[in-house]
């Protein structure tokens, strides 16, 4: 899979920064984002994107990849899609290790197909667990149909 250097750099930066504030105190994340209603676990991505933007980051695709990496975004380019997949397929996760390992091995050969599968798996898990399905997630799924 050939990736232009500029895009490759965005993928690396997204992977490096997307969870930078994952363990930050919730009051700090709410202060950064101004968000008083979203679930705690969804605040770190937007907070990182806001901080990066304040520090001068101008690559909107990178900022959007990080901002929406927990819920998805139908308007993502390859950077957002790659981060969404990587976040789900990361080897350190305990669930469905074999299935995720197989999917990860297929990314270079079938990027869009694997992305669709990851979105489907994440959506199915949310439904099965009785979690709220965010509008961004629904819009992402519908954009892939």
Task: List where the protein language model places each region.
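Divalent metal-dependent catalytic cores for phosphoryl transfer on phosphate-bearing substrates
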Residues: 1-116
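Amphipathic, Lys/Arg-enriched alpha-helical patches that create a basic surface
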Residues: 114-124
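Charged phosphate-binding loop/patch that engages nucleotide di/tri-phosphates or the phosphate backbone
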Residues: 124-145
């Amino acid at each position: 899979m050939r990736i232009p250097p500029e895009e490759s750099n965005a993928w690396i930066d997204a992977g490096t920064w997307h969870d930078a504030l994952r363990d930050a105190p919730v009051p700090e994340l709410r202060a950064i984002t101004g968000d008083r209603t979203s679930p705690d676990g969804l605040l770190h991505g937007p907070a990182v994107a806001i901080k990066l933007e304040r520090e001068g980051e101008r690559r909107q695709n990178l900022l959007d990849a990080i901002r929406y990496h927990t819920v998805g975004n139908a308007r993502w380019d390859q950077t957002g899609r790659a981060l969404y997949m990587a976040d789900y397929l990361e080897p350190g996760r305990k669930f469905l290790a074999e299935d995720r390992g197989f999917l990860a091995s297929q990314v270079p050969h079938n990027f869009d197909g694997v992305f669709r599968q990851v979105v489907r798996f994440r959506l199915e898990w949310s439904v099965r667990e009785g979690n709220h399905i965010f509008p961004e997630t629904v819009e992402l799924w519908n954009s892939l149909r």
